[in-house]
C-alpha cells in the first residue's frame, strides 16, 4: 500500500524534487550572500592599508575554507551525473570553466599586492560566482530533475554529506544489468566523480558499453582508464578508474605527440 506521504503532485511544494531544488537554491543564495558581504569591504569601501589587508585576508580565507570546497562538492554531486548526458554535457563543461575562473580569481586575490588588484580579484570572484550559481539554479538543477537515472533528491543529499565533511560510499563494483538502459549513465558518472586519483571500480553490464566509453571520452578526455576484464557474450566487466594527474598529463602529451 502506498503511503500518503509518498503521494504528491509533480512541481508542487510536496514534490521531493521541487523541495530539493529549493534547498539547493537556498544553499547557493547563502553562499553568494556571504561572499558578497565580504567582498564589499574591498569593492565598495576605501580602506586604510591595514584594514584592506585584513579584509583581503578574510575573503581569501573564506574562499579557501568554504567557497572552493563548496564548488568541488557541487561538481562531484551535481555536475558529474550530468557530465555525460547529451542534453547537459556542454552545460557542465561551461560551468566547470566558470569554476576554473573563480579558482584563478581566488589565487589573484590571495596574492594581490595593491588595493586595485585586490578589488579587481574580489569583484571577479563575486560576479563569476553569481553567474555560475544562477545558471546552476535556473538550468542545471531543473535539467537534473528531468534526467533519466538522476535522482535529484539523492544528489542533494550527497552534496550535504560532502559539505558536512563525510565521505560518500565508493562501491568496488557497479552492476547496472537490472537498471533500465536510459538510467544507467548518470549513476556511473556519479560514481566516477567520487574516485580519488588512482582509484577505480568495476562496471558490470549485459552489453559492450561502447556508448558509455564515448561519453567518458567527451566528458573526461585523457583522465580515465578503461580496461576490459570480461567481454561477453552475456556479461561485460570493465574496470574504470581515475588517472593520477601525472599519468593523465603524460597520456595527453603522448596523444599530441604520437
Whereabouts are the PLM-identified features?
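Small-residue-biased structural context
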Residues: 1-258
